[in-house]
Regions:
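Flexible glycine-/small-residue-rich
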Residues: 31, 81-83, 96, 105
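Short, well-structured beta-strand/strand-turn elements
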Residues: 49-62
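C-terminal recognition in membrane/secretory proteostasis and scaffolding
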Residues: 4, 70, 103-138
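Short acidic, Pro/Gly- and aromatic-enriched capping/linker segments at domain boundaries
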Residues: 73-82
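Gly/Ser/Thr-rich loop/hinge elements
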Residues: 1-37, 64-69, 85
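C-terminal soluble interaction/assembly domains
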Residues: 66, 94-95, 99-105
C-alpha cells in the first residue's frame, strides 16, 4: 500500500491485508489543507491505485515518521526518522497530495458545501457506470 524510507535510505514496504470485502465499493475521498498524516497516506494510496478520486484542495504535507525521546533532564527531543511515500513513490512530506478534482473557495463553509456537492456528483457518475472508478480524474 505504501512505503517508508528511513534516514539511512532503508525502504520498508507496508501492505494492506484482508479479504477485500469493499474492493468494488464506489467511493470518493474529500481532502483539504487540514488533512494530514494518515489521511494523506490513504489519499495517496487511493489515487495511485485509481481506487477513488480525491476531491477538494491540496493536503497539509505531513509525511514524516516521528518519535519523542525523553531526556534525563525532563526535556524531550522530537526526531524524524523516516518519511512516507505513496505506492508510486510520490513524497508526502512538504508537498501534500494534490486533488484529482480541485474545489477551493476563500469561504471555508462554502468550500465544504461545494466539495460535498462535487463528491456527490462524482460518486453518482461512478455508480451510473460512466467509466471506471479512476476515470473521474481530469
Amino acid at each position: 500500500m505504501l512505503y517508508e524510507v528511513d534516514g539511512s535510505g532503508r525502504r520498508t514496504d507496508h501492505k494492506a491485508t484482508g479479504n477485500g470485502e469493499f474492493a468494488d465499493f464506489p467511493m470518493v475521498l474529500l481532502a483539504n489543507g487540514f488533512s494530514a498524516s494518515a489521511s494523506e497516506i490513504l489519499a495517496g494510496a487511493l489515487q495511485d491505485y485509481d481506487r477513488a478520486p480525491v476531491i477538494g484542495d491540496t493536503t497539509f504535507g505531513k509525511g514524516s515518521v516521528n518519535i519523542l525521546r525523553r531526556l534525563e533532564n525532563g526535556g524531550g527531543l522530537y526526531l524524524t526518522f523516516a518519511k512516507w511515500f505513496t505506492p508510486e513513490g510520490r513524497p508526502i512530506e512538504g508537498t501534500g497530495i494534490d486533488p484529482d478534482i480541485e474545489v477551493v473557495s476563500r469561504d471555508s463553509q462554502k468550500a465544504d458545501i461545494d466539495q460535498l456537492n462535487k463528491a456527490n456528483e462524482t460518486l453518482e457518475s461512478i455508480v451510473a457506470g460512466k467509466g471506471a472508478l479512476g476515470s473521474a480524474r481530469p
